[in-house]
C-alpha cells in the first residue's frame, strides 16, 4: 500500500514539474524578447 502511495505521489509530481519547467522557459523567452526590443 505504501508503494501505491509513492507511485501516486510521483505520478502527481511529474505534470507539476513539467508545467513549472514550461512556465519558467516561457518567462525567460518573454524576458529575452523584451530585452531585444
Curated annotation (Swiss-Prot):
It is a single-pass membrane protein. The keyword Heme does not apply. The chain crosses the membrane at residues 5-25. InterPro entries: Cyt_6/f_cplx_su5 (IPR003683), Cyt_6/f_cplx_su5_sf (IPR036099). One of its GO terms (molecular function) is electron transporter, transferring electrons within cytochrome b6/f complex of photosystem II activity. Signal peptide: none annotated. Component of the cytochrome b6-f complex, which mediates electron transfer between photosystem II (PSII) and photosystem I (PSI), cyclic electron flow around PSI, and state transitions. PetG is required for either the stability or assembly of the cytochrome b6-f complex. This is Cytochrome b6-f complex subunit 5. It comes from Mesostigma viride.
Amino acid at each position: 500500500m505504501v508503494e501505491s502511495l509513492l507511485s501516486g505521489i510521483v505520478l502527481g509530481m511529474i505534470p507539476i514539474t513539467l508545467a513549472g519547467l514550461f512556465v519558467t522557459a516561457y518567462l525567460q523567452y518573454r524576458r529575452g524578447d523584451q530585452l531585444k526590443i
